[in-house]
Amino acid sequence: YEVVVEELFTNVQQLSMEVESVHLDGQQLVNDAVSMLDRVATTQLTDEETSYAFAHIYDVKANTEAVEEIVKIFMSRADTQKAANVTEKLAVLNDTIAYYEVGKEDYVNYSYFTSKQKEELIAAISDVRDALKEMNSSLK
């Protein structure tokens, strides 16, 4: 066991040193969140492929939660109005997602959505994406 413990200790020390040298750029992280939402709104939800439709809303919810965490981190560095706009748009998106929730953390299969429902969800995602872009331009 001593060899394994020593190797683990060495690896943890090395990782610790590497983590100290990582620089996270706020604007890049917010840009990544914008890109993530853009992919969902313009590719995933508009794709005619239905074999993964059962998972689309789960993916939208996970992406929304990730964006919320990024916004929490950088909200204090952004213009107050622009940050509030993102929060507002996220609330609308969360309400839209919640409408399709069935039970606890289960969702209606996206393939059952009407065209109008799909458009509403995509619009809510796009609104968050656009608000994030605006917030990102104001990061200090």
Could you tell me what each predicted segment is?
Residues 1-140:
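Mature extracytoplasmic or organellar-lumen-exposed domains after removal of signal/transit peptides
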